[in-house]
Amino acid sequence: MSKSRFKKLAAAGAGVAVAATALIGANASPAFAAYDIKVGLTPINSVGAYQYAIDSGMFRKNGINVTQTIPFPAPPPSIAALASGAVDFTYAPSIAIINAYANAGMALKVIAPADGYDMASLIKSKTNPAVAAGLDDTGVCVSPTSGINSWKDLTGKTVAVPARKTQGEVTIANAVKKDGGNAASINWVTLGFPQMVDAVKSGKVDAAFVVSPFTSDCTTAGQKILGYPGVAFFTNELAIGLWVTTADYAAKNPATVLAFQKSIAQANAFAMASKANMRKVILASTKLTGSTPAEALAANSPVYPKTVTKIDLQNPASKMLALGYLTKPLDTAGLLYTQYRGR
C-alpha cells in the first residue's frame, strides 16, 4: 500500500486547491461534455466504479466533464466541501450524510448508490462469520495480545476512527452495546486510514476502524480483525456508501444530476455484470487509493446496489437515535432525491 501517496491525496483534498490537470480522474473532453463537475471522495476501493466511469468514457458520453476529483481523508470534510461549493458531488456513507443533515443542518440530496450489500449475503452474514468477512469492507483492527476478543471488550478502550460520529464510530458503538458493553466509555480518537494499523501495532490505540484496502493491512502487519461492524449494524439497508449533492445544486442543475446518476448507474451495472468486469473496476480504484493491483484484488470485492431507497436512510437514522447520535426522530424523506431507473 502506498501510504505516502494516500497522504498526499488527502492533504491536497483538505486544501481543495489542486489544478484540474494534476488531479486523479481529471477529464477534459469539451467536444463530448456539456456539464463540468468537481467530485469529492475518500480514496477507498469501492470508488473504483466512479473511476471506471471516467476511464471508460461513460461520463463523457452522458455529457459530463469531470474537471476535478478531490480526495479527502474522511467523509465529513468532503461533505463540508460540498456545502461550501468546493465540489459539486461527493461520496459519503449514509451515517455521515444523516449526521450532517440532522445535526449540522445541511440541506443535502442523496442521488445515487456508491456501494453496499446484497440482501442474501447480508442475511447470511448475521450467522456466518466467513460470509461477514467476505462481505463487509470495514473491520476493527486489534492486537492479538490485547485481550480484546469481543465487542464488549472495547469498553473503556481507546478506539481510532477517521472522523467522529460517522460510520466507524456509530457501527462500533452499536456492536459494543449489542454485546453488553458500554460504548459511552470508549475514548474515541481520530486518525487517517493509513495510520490506523500502525497505531494499533505500536499500542497508541487499542483498536482502529479500517476499510478496504486497509483492512487487509491489519492481518498483514500481524494484527487481527476483531469483527465486522458494518454487517452488524445494517439489517436490510443495501445502499451504504452514497453519492450526494446539495439541495440547492440539485434544484439548479437537474440535467447535470441526471447525467451523473446515469453514469454511475452504468458503471455500477458494468461492475456487477461479471467477475471480469469487476476486476476492471477494482483495478481502476488503484488510481485513487494508491494500492497495488495485487492489494486491491485481494480485498473484498465491492457490491454496487442499483438504487437508494428510503429504508437505506430511515433505518440508520432510527438506529442512530437509539444510540444517542440523534437527539430526535428524523424523517429522511427529504434527503432522498428521485433515483435514476434507466440504463
Residue ranges: model-predicted function:
Residues 2-14:
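Bacterial N-terminal signal peptides that target proteins for export
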